Each structure stands twice: as structure tokens, then as C-alpha cells.
Amino acid sequence: MADLEAVLADVSYLMAMEKSKATPAARASKKIVLPEPSIRSVMQKYLEERHEITFDKIFNQRIGFLLFKDFCLNEINEAVPQVKFYEEIKEYEKLENEEDRLCRSRQIYDTYIMKELLSCSHPFSKQAVEHVQSHLSKKQVTSTLFQPYIEEICESLRGSIFQKFMESDKFTRFCQWKNVELNIHLTMNDFSVHRIIGRGGFGEVYGCRKADTGKMYAMKCLDKKRIKMKQGETLALNERIMLSLVSTGDCPFIVCMTYAFHTPDKLCFILDLMNGGDLHYHLSQHGVFSEKEMRFYATEIILGLEHMHNRFVVYRDLKPANILLDEHGHVRISDLGLACDFSKKKPHASVGTHGYMAPEVLQKGTAYDSSADWFSLGCMLFKLLRGHSPFRQHKTKDKHEIDRMTLTMNVELPDVFSPELKSLLEGLLQRDVSKRLGCHGGSAQELKTHDFFRGIDWQHVYLQKYPPPLIPPRGEVNAADAFDIGSFDEEDTKGIKLLDCDQELYKNFPLVISERWQQEVAETVYEAVNADTDKIEARKRAKNKQLGHEEDYALGRDCIVHGYMLKLGNPFLTQWQRRYFYLFPNRLEWRGEGESRQSLLTMEQIVSVEETQIKDKKCILLRIKGGKQFVLQCESDPEFVQWKKELTETFMEAQRLLRRAPKFLNKSRSAVVELSKPPLCHRNSNGL
């Protein structure tokens, strides 16, 4: 029976994988719903205050670029060929071989440069033209051939074109998407969890599918009780910090994190899913690798380490078991549980796996940095070639003996190794850090220029253009059976109680990596969500021709911010009512959707603006003269932050002005005034 359950778990998992690759959006069981366009008022202020409304910030975000491109190609009157030129250059940079680059570079030159030069309409500098012409004439078609144009294209788009984008519906849509992104609160209900694929000291790893996009991920779940029992809180939180550091910027050679969240019992990391098994497993199945095969893995691992080291992260646990393969055979470095940030203080703890730890790591109290990873790389490459670590001779398992040999033994390299390979390994396995390859100030660049990697195009490595030596079998999970992986004994943690102080440790644990979420959306449901939203907004615009548009009321007035909020209503203050609010310097107005009557609360009547909580939801509490309360709830986190800020500042400024005003202005008024729409329409530009 257990075997049947294991087979069914594998089949379900593999079917989910195949469907996710073909049509991930079709696998989405939840829908992303964009907020209404009126969100722009609040979101623009929110983003501006965080310096997020600039050309570079928007253009360099995936969703921002897609919307800007859509605006340039479909909504602006004047032609904007620069955007297509930019995309052509980006595609050119990904090309694999020189022949393809030569052909494409000439096409780009003829279409976007020569054609405009002949018509005397070329808007770019003479230096950019000469740079491309000079290199093309010598057939020097590197991936950076058009780099001067990238900079000038961005400069040409940064001015009036970007300003027009800011005034368009496409910028409104950008605000809608950013509101969704900044209001993500993940729970287990946002994922379909499949079979277990691994287990560690604190928890398990599962295959899972994200419900609203259909994308497949690995979910690493750490048990909070087990963490407490083993006093591993610092390690667990450190892994979250290290993953957040390395998961920004595109790196195809690290198992990166897209989300982190927690439940009352678990800490959850949502990571890149790797289906090809690990190098330790394949070493046992395939046998030792040739120099050529090892070189392939070395190049990709070097780029992964370079990405970490550029962010001042030392990995400290490099070994074949931590190198995972994807379905195509390319590799990623996984499990950053022992990684460490050395930007402010160098570590000196002895951590890692015996047989791969550098001498300076073994010498307690000795500070080290990225140097330790280059030594570990040497040990790992040796194992791929010989089947064992250079310091684990005769299959000894005595950790003290392995450490002693690491600190004292000179590694003898077999004669079958090529001179270039011997030179590489001798350089990496130097006990003296000052003599070690990668530790002379050039870091990864020292390895890239080593003779062993002569002829390697590192841009091709980055783009994963070299064919892997081993392709994992399709249609297999490439992981141990669920029953072989096993499970934790619940009795171990039966007596462990999680207290409020334990949960407080994890209050800042949740995280969304913006660029990775945007990429996930762009690859899956972006177009479908936009199309659905366009239909909904078109229907609402048609309906509002009779009723009047909520946002229109704020135009041409001194309205500070406007948008939907929930107001605690009815005589018993138990029911939330959705209303459209307008904040002016001296009052807060609101009305129901489609209603013509307007309600008003003056700043003069407000005693204080406070934050409160109702059923774990943050709310804005306005205390009103006479002991009454006015409670508002926002539909997203950014809205709450911005509305609370604007209401507080407006109230404080109104109080300052009232203290200076003549006393006769402070006549008693009712707290809330019901007004019909026509009198409001006849007010002056100050709203009075």
C-alpha cells in the first residue's frame, strides 16, 4: 500500500510539473484581481515618497517596462522606435555564437542606425555610431557591441515621453499592479503542496504550485518547535537574510527565494524548484566525471559564487550534495543555511562539512571571508574527478583525521590530470590564503582567466548556452521515495511549547522579492489579468456615465488624496460600509458608490487621529468631539500607511491654523454633515 501511495504521489507531482510548464496560467486556481483605477491617487503618493516614481525605477522593473513599452507602441501619437531598438539589442546580447551575433548586429545596424543616418534623423551621438561601425568593420561582435546605445536610448526616453506615460492610463495600471505586489500576505492556502522531495535538520522540502499563477516552486518548511528545541533560531533567520541578499539580480546558478512567510508552526521559504537531483547523487550513479565534464560544472558554480561574493556573502558549505541540477542539466548552488554576510565583520566560526572546509575555517578564532569558498571549490572539483575529497583518503570517516590532513597535508595530484587542471587545483587548495587562487584581489576573475578555462565564453556560461554533460531523465522525480526520505518523530517536540516571545522573533520574516514576483506574473497571468481588468473597467465607465465618476469630483480642487475605504457604520458600529473618500485641507468627504449625496466631517471636529486594531486588521480611528468615534479600514497595506499619514498631517496642520484663527470661527458644529451634490458643485476651488 505504501508503494502505491508513493507512485501516486510521484504521478501527481509530475503531472503538475508538465501542466505548469505548458500553460501555467491555466493551472491557476485563484485569480489576481487588480484594484480599481482610483488607487492611483494613493499609490502615486506612496511610491513618490519612497522615490519609486522615476524613469529608471519603472523602466527597470519587469511590469513597469511592459507597460511603458505598451504605452510607447500603442498610445502615444509620435513614433517611439527606441523601445523596439532597445529590445532588439537585449535579444542580440543573448545570442549564443559569433556567427549569429554578426548576422543580427548587421540587421540591427541597417534597421535602426543606417536607415536613420541616411534620412538624417538619427537621434544618437556620433560616438555611439562610430563605436558600432568600428567594431562591425573588424567583425568584433561582442555581447556589449551596442552598449553605448542602451545608455542613449534610456536618456531619450527619460524626458517628455516618460512624462506623458506618467499622465496615461498605463501608469495607472502600474499603480494597480504595485498595489497588488505590496499587499501580498501569503499563507499555505496560496499553494498546492505536492510530494516531499527532501529533508534537513529542521524540516522538509516539498514540490508546490502557486495558486494564482500556476508556477511550480520548492517549499522549504522549517518546524518552529524543532528550531526551538535545537536552539536554531539564529540559523533559521540567517538563512532568510542570506537568501534575500542573493535573490536580487538575475543569477541562474543559485537556488533563489521568491517568497518567505510563516504560519503558527512553520517557517516557509518558496524557492526555485530543481528537478534533476544533486551532484552527489549523480556522481554515485554516473561515476567520476572527465575534465571536460567537470569544467562545465565548475564554470556555472564559479558564477554562482561570484554572485554571492559580490554581495559580501561567503557560502561555507560547498559540496556536491548542495549542487542541484535542473531538468536540462544546468546547476544551482542550494541551501544557504551556513552562509554568512562578511560586509561589516568577518566570520571566524568553524562551520561546514569536513573534507571541504578551508584551513582558516578549521583554525578557531581565525577571521576569513570569501577565500574559504575557493578552497572548498578545489575540494569539490577534486571529488567530481576522483570520487572522494582530497583529504578523505582511504574512505576515512574520522573527522579529526580529515581536519588534521586538511591543515597539514600537501595534496598530490594524479599524473593523469592535465597541467592546466593541476595548476587550477594547486591554486585553489593553497593552505596560505595569500597564495590561493581567487584571493589576490581579483576574486572570481582570477579563476575565469586561468588557463584551465581558456576558450570559455563566460557570457555563454551566464546565458546557459553550453550543453550540459548530463541530462536528468525526464518523467522521473529524481529524488528518493517519500517513504525513504522519512519523517520527523513527533515525540521529539511533544514537550516544546511556542510562546508569544518565540513568535515575536519571526515578526519580520515575511518577504516578497519584487523582481522575482514580477517575472513570475509576466511569465504566467499578466496578459490575462490585464484583459479581464480592461473589461471590468470598461463596463464600469459605461455605468458611470449616468452616475458620475468618483475620481472626477477631485479634479480641479485642492483634494490631497482620494479613494475607497471601509467605514464602520450602522447604529451599533458593527458593519463595514465601502465608501469613496476625499481628503481636503479642512475636511473629509465621502459618498457611497453611485450615490449623489455627500457626507462631510470637518477637521475642526476631530480630536485625534490614531491607529487601532479590529479583528487583527489595522484601522484608522478618528476621535470626534462629543466622545464619538469614526473608524476607517483600508483595503491594502500601502493605502493604510498613506491614508493614516495624510489624515494625521492634515489634522495637525488644521489644528495649527485653528489655533491662529479668531475665536469666532470656532462655533459649534455637528460632527457629520449630510450634503446633497449640487451645493458641493458650486463651491470655489478651495472647496468652501
Swiss-Prot record:
GO molecular function: ATP binding; beta-adrenergic receptor kinase activity; G protein-coupled receptor binding; G protein-coupled receptor kinase activity
Taxonomic classification: Eukaryota, Metazoa, Chordata, Craniata, Vertebrata
Residue ranges constituting the PH domain according to the UniProt record: 558-652
Binding site for ATP: I197, G198, R199, G200, G201, F202, G203, E204, V205, K220
Name of protein: G protein-coupled receptor kinase 3
Keywords carried by this UniProt record: ATP-binding, Cell projection, Kinase, Nucleotide-binding, Serine/threonine-protein kinase, Synapse, Transferase, Ubl conjugation
Domain AGC-kinase C-terminal: from-to ranges: 454-521
Single GO biological process annotation from the record: G protein-coupled receptor signaling pathway
Catalytic reaction equation(s): [beta-adrenergic receptor] + ATP = [beta-adrenergic receptor]-phosphate + ADP + H(+)
Originating gene: GRK3
CDD domains: PH_GRK2_subgroup, RGS_GRK2_GRK3, STKc_GRK3
Domain Protein kinase as annotated: residue spans: 191-453
Annotated source species: Bos taurus
